[in-house]
UniProtKB/Swiss-Prot annotation:
Pfam families xrefs: TELO2_ARM (PF25320), Telomere_reg-2 (PF10193)
GO biological process, one term: 'de novo' cotranslational protein folding
GO CC annotation: cytoplasm; cytosol; TTT Hsp90 cochaperone complex
Keyword Lipoprotein: no
Binding partners and assembly: Component of the TORC1 complex composed of at least mip1, orb5, tel2, toc1, toc89, tor2, tti1 and wat1. Component of the TORC2 complex composed of at least bit61, orb5, sin1, ste20, tel2, tor1, tti1 and wat1. Interacts with tti1.
Species of the source: Schizosaccharomyces pombe (strain 972 / ATCC 24843)
Function: Component of the TORC1 and TORC2 complexes required for the regulation of the cellular respons to changes in available nutrients. Required for normal entry into S phase. Regulates activation of the DNA replication checkpoint. Required for efficient phosphorylation of mrc1, which is essential for the activation of cds1 kinase. Also plays an important role in genome stability.
Major subcellular site: cytoplasm
Gene for this chain: tel2
PTM-bearing positions, type Phosphoserine: S490
Molecular function via GO: Hsp90 protein binding; telomeric DNA binding
Compositionally biased tracts (Acidic residues): 484-497
Protein name as catalogued: DNA replication checkpoint protein tel2
Amino acid sequence: MKSFASELSKPIQKPRLKEILKELQHIGVPSPCNLRLYHELISVIVPTFWNGKINSEIDFLLAKCFSTLLGLKLLCVRLDNFVQEANLQNIHLVTVYLELLEKAFECIDLDDNCKLIWESTVLSDHQKQSLWTEFIFFLGNFKITNSMSAAMLTFKVYDDSKRLKASSMADYIGVLSSKLACIISKPAVKTPEIYSKLFHYLLHSSNLKAFINPLIPLTQKFCVQLQKLFADLTVSDQMLFLNQLLLEHNTKYPTNFSYSTARDDRITGSLATLLRLNFSSTHFLRLIEFYWGVPTNLIIKRVEVVCSSISYKESDKKELEKTVDSLFNIWSNAQFLRSYTLLAQESLTIYLLLFIPKLEAKYLNNLSKSLMFSNAISCRLDSLDDDIRMHGMIMAEVISTYSGVSLSNPLAFDVPIMKTTKAKVLKSLSSLKDEFLPIEILNDESVIAETSIEKEETNVTHLEKPVISKNDDLIRGDDLEPYDFPDIDSEDTDDDPTVSRSKTHSPVYVQDLCKMLKDTESFEKQRVALENASKLIKRKSAFGTELRDHADELLQTLISLQNRFDLMNFDEMQMTAIVELLLTCLDICGPVICTNLFVSDYSMRQKILILSCISLAASKFNDDDNERLFPSQLLPGNLHDQFYSPTIEKISDELERKLVFPVMSECKDYAEGPKFLQTRYISKQSEIESKKPLPKANRLSLKVDKSLFLLLTSGYMLASRKTAFIEPLFLVYYLKTLGILFFETFTSKIEGANRMLREYVDVLNEVCRLRSDTPEVNEGLLFSFLAILEISSGRTLANEFGKHLLFFEAYTKFLFESPDQGEKVKSLSAAVLILFENKLSEFRTLALEKLLDDSAPLVPERFGLAGL
């Protein structure tokens, strides 16, 4: 090694350099000699012989030499030194080292590095373990990405057109995950457990999707190495990996909760077989205990129950009963009804209904006689919420059926709520007979779907054109001389490139619209599809079930659409189509769009698009005045779109003015004194009545709570710990959307109003705890306070939400006194404080009493504190 180092320090020819580099492929173990070799390579050889070509043999040999722990760390240290100096004269060296580090990262062989360290003869066992831990920590802590990103940002050597994989977090995770999957797939690897720490680091990274995707093929076959690695993980890592794997399948196999098809049964059975190849029933029991509140579709819930309940071991049956006991303990707790959202309660109820047929009758009989079960059913029957009472009735009926308590006279609640479609669907879950099916069904499913679509297209009968017989005697004109046509018409020739030979027709069916939108290679199809999307949706909503059958697919396609061709008014056409789809199929598209907002990996633009469409749809449900105006009463098209097209900012600003104006008028009268006496003509009663607007039915209030509002609140509470959902830009649109939904809904009395108000207050309380410094976020909070104070009565707020109301008032005072929030926030907070005083002037004592009730029992001395 010393001779190599001295030889590299002198001028050297390329053939001799190649021979030396081939001998230096395994010098990754730290030692003084190896360190000197790397110093000569990085200082002399790399700046001289690196050319950055793809097929260069010297570049490849250098990258292989530096693809060890020592080489990678030296490159990162050299880049960090350049960043600290920030000398632009070193830009050429920085570019060379960046390219070398990128290629060395691609050449990393985890198996070779493992053998290099663990089979070393110069290291002790303790040194081997320490060096391997350092190598895994170096890769899992993203040191390469951090050093490359800092160098690229400082010297600006690469733009977006040429991106290095190792500098991108997602690409870095994807490459390492692919290398890890390649190692695990090798049957010769005897100890895959040594990679469990790297698995842990990548599993807790910021991009789980990039980590999971390369590992999915391993789960589709029986892999002993994956099982060994999975067993060496901690329980929390096991559950996190399984949950993310199921979420990927959740997006791949969507379903409709309203009805179960034979396709769902086949997918459930084959997917359960696929997942049980490498994971035991105990893993899925733990997964349900950990993540029963995660919003997944019915297929995934059925798969989890099948994988966790079908087993021939007595120990697994005991574990199943323990898991059901723990789930029933949560379900029967009185705090569960008050603390968890309705979506989470329904999710746990579905799991229990799916588990009941898998349990023995003796266990269910003992459960039905227990005090825990009796208290749970009685608490739900006493609830004022229809859905909660329905859950209790269904659970009582199903358990009485399967426990054999009343075979001759089964329990049945003959009430209207049990005759609804949702109640029938929930009750039918206990009669599902899921079982393991062959895995090949998953591969055949896409083929079946494609062939069914092709059959539908071929079955469309094309009407033949009517044959019109012409009588030559009638149309013959002997006295008319025909014109002479030229032999060649240059304007109509087929060789004219300006003539469009195939015209793209407007879509007639919803399925055709989806196909045209998905065709990302045709500019004309994208343009025609977007221009006609809203018209086709409105036309199809008037008759038939075609739109409802394909509403989910059309919604997903519209949201994921990108402006690849720079179409004019692309955003407006996309938003108009989504809004029209929400207006016509809110019961189908509402839950899908709200769930995907928090579950799917959407960009910030797509999240803002979803929230804006929800707000516009809510405002259009009860506002159709614009459609009744004659064209003469409207501005020209472009001016009308500019000044009157609704956006979420315009809607929220209009509502703010509507809510704040009465308060400001009262303050102005109080400050300036009473106005002089004004007189006006007293009109006839008939004239007054004729000018009043006609009352309109609030169509939004019939669907908003279960289709939009509750899903938005519960989804945020479950995902509020993720960084993407506490960014100021998202919070601004989210708060304004909730405020618009709340205000537009409560123009008439609706059922479940208290539940909506409670969940709205919980979300605002969670956002207030963030203490955002962004004025726009605080403006959204104040807008929400205005909506709550305007809609709800003072007694209801003080009695139900006294503690939260006083907290909101204190937070508003903090914003009013803060010098960094701006004039708009200060004026809004002043109006909110006045409304707080008006609402709580008579009920402040009641709010304080409720606040004291939450902390400790009332004693006579504390009534004095409350001002009683």
